[in-house]
């Protein structure tokens, strides 16, 4: 790409004006999107306007439409809700209201509108756009605008960002706010679990979501609920009997609590609402259990946005500005969506239509179709939920297999959820499942035991590694490991862990030449805070670590804001992998993030100091700098701290903070619980097929490359890749993959921190179509 093309982004918005508004129900992460739209808009040379109070502000005009500055969006990244206000607006539904809105935009020369809201808000925006030329001619006839103004504003570009905690918009895997709402729900479920266990209670929890069961479904997966009611898939006619039998079975197996999740729009097969109170009365009447109802309500909309929502909002905001400024009169109004980990642009009305089709299918009791229209991600959640929640584990049948599961490497939140899912899916398949303690030391020392259904009860929400996790590699102990594989008749191995799990897998492949016992299928599920396992864009545990860093950075920024003129240098974990530092930098609004993958010199450090000196002259008198622990052996945290302290003398003072092992702990986030659960299920389904395939002459013999794989998320799908094929994609010295997708987000971090850099626009999304997208949609 030429320098001219690079530089084009800096002048893309010159002479243009963008208005940003939030409409409908608020959602955490909207502020991140507003901030990104404002800053990237200003970066491209455009003028950016806030529209306060949603469409009402657009109709009322006046002070409701104000020009935004770089500083006006500072310190809003970590705030929930929407700082610019939102309102349900009746006026905009009438043509008269839209006429006034058009007048307000034309007078300010605004021809680009970024709308952050739900499907109703986005439909309103599309109507506005389609009427635009008629509205202008009416205004001109009425003498409210001149012919010149009408020509200057001849067409209106519209881009939508979906902000809704319900995740009810078709065409995107996640809407802004959904992950944070799941955080709120999970925090409450975890808190309720402890009291329910103390009193042997049953809790019925009602979660929001209107006519979409996403929140209820994912919550039930991430807390291991006994039953879930969602509108898309009403229970069978005799569900009352099934539910009561299920609850009493759980109690007989030794569980001290039952959790039932009810989506607020839940209905039965006849369309009759299922209420939380109704479910409670049923349980009390039939079983006599001590039962309580908790309606979570608006708590779910509140609180601090999660790291996921801040990054999602920021990425979507950048993409929205690019889509607006690249728009022509012929480009349809589009919505920026997330597919897997990729930003895509989809025609707004196609998405709205499919979203309406879901509601129509549910109204007409075509529930299977409603499920399909929600997309593959929703279907997958439902399939895994049904597997884990609704089946009594069968007794191991003859011809069953024995699969062992272990944790390798440093502990990561979500490992236990992956173990639970692996064990239970294995048992459901009718197989024997063994758990191995202390990583590869376990099979060497024979620390292996059989796991039953209850063995992993309640593991989903527990952090760390309950099986014990060591970094030891298997090579030195091949003889003992082989002996124990034979002794315990292990026919398949699930390895949940970080880079050591991957290198251990490579050693097992190598060892097959000497030891026939090692010729069994194995699969590696990446689980490490560092997110440095080749073959996967995400690792279990990285999201939890990211949220821990974010929370800490928020507190540190608050301290710095109170002190004024203070810069904090924070060291994050990750080995040589800069994922945590980069993503936390994006989510916490850092001024710089130093990483190994992007070499830096003393001149870069000097430029950062000068940048902070300039920043201290503005109204924002604080700085936040992140440094990955191994980004440079000489430019240590102490060195950078000393440099900043010296160079900033008299202008700002510096403090340093090494976050350390707190990043490995904590209760797993909903994302990690859900991701781990689905990875475990997917791995065991693969394992069952692979063992059958490798069964020869009365024993398992697997020596093909595809019998030892890493299960990873790649762009939009979960894929199995042979460990041997990943070798040439790995930098073994620094324990990182040679190519990492998140490096493309680095320029966004720098632009949002006000650096004068060139933005490569070639990476931006192109317009796709929803039907085509759905067939290749992410399976996560």
UniProtKB/Swiss-Prot annotation:
Modifications the protein undergoes after translation, according to the UniProt entry: GlcNAcylation decreases enzyme activity.
Region (N-terminal catalytic PFK domain 1): 2-390
Keyword rRNA processing: no
Residues of the active site: 166
Binding-site residues, substrate: 164-166, 201, 208-210, 264, 292, 298-301
GO molecular function: 6-phosphofructokinase activity; AMP binding; ATP binding; fructose-6-phosphate binding; identical protein binding; metal ion binding; monosaccharide binding
Sites of Phosphoserine modification: 133, 377, 667, 775
EC number: 2.7.1.11
Residues modified to N-acetylthreonine: 2
Glycosites: 530
Region of interest (C-terminal regulatory PFK domain 2), ranges: 402-780
Reactions accelerated catalytically: beta-D-fructose 6-phosphate + ATP = beta-D-fructose 1,6-bisphosphate + ADP + H(+)
Any GO CC annotation of this UniProt entry: membrane
Primary localization class, coarse: cytoplasm
Keyword Kinase tagged: yes
Regulation of its activity: Allosterically activated by ADP, AMP, or fructose 2,6-bisphosphate, and allosterically inhibited by ATP or citrate.
Names of required cofactors: Mg(2+)
Keywords on record: Acetylation, Allosteric enzyme, ATP-binding, Cytoplasm, Glycolysis, Glycoprotein, Hydroxylation, Kinase, Magnesium, Metal-binding, Nucleotide-binding, Phosphoprotein, Transferase
Role: Catalyzes the phosphorylation of D-fructose 6-phosphate to fructose 1,6-bisphosphate by ATP, the first committing step of glycolysis.
HAMAP family: Phosphofructokinase_I_E
PANTHER family: ATP-DEPENDENT 6-PHOSPHOFRUCTOKINASE, MUSCLE TYPE, PHOSPHOFRUCTOKINASE
Assembly and oligomerization: Homo- and heterotetramers. Phosphofructokinase (PFK) enzyme functions as a tetramer composed of different combinations of 3 types of subunits, called PFKM (M), PFKL (L) and PFKP (P). The composition of the PFK tetramer differs according to the tissue type it is present in. The kinetic and regulatory properties of the tetrameric enzyme are dependent on the subunit composition, hence can vary across tissues. Interacts (via C-terminus) with HK1 (via N-terminal spermatogenic cell-specific region).
Protein name: ATP-dependent 6-phosphofructokinase, muscle type
The organism of origin for this protein: Oryctolagus cuniculus (Rabbit)
Gene behind this protein: PFKM
